[in-house]
Amino acid sequence: MLRAFEDAGVDLFHASTRRFGDPEWPESDLGLAGWARKLSGKPVIAVGGVGLTVDMVETFSGKDTNASPDINFPALAKRFNAHEFDLIAIGRSNIADPDWVAKVRDGRPDFIRQFKLADLGDVAEEAKQASTKAS
């Protein structure tokens, strides 16, 4: 499938998963971003749970998010230094606190505002209802 995208002119892949650092298959330590990079040789953006302990599905179930860049930065640094991805995207953490990157850069993680389901507004209620129906 990656080959078809490459043939169509894709020059960057965005590998979005619940948790960027989780291996995609049990036989390998590579996450989805790592596999995309390995198979295509193209630059890859990884995303999924950066600085968070709870994934989006758990958030919709009412589980509180503990936010800190220290939570999974060792895994992020390890995978980045292993050239599994070229860029990292920040989703929920940046929705909750638009200054997240600056606070991490400046060594002020204690000032990061944690993501709450209410940060998504009306979308949160619709997703919560859909999640309840699916259960």
Model-based region annotation:
Residues M1-S135:
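Flavin-dependent oxidoreductase catalytic cores
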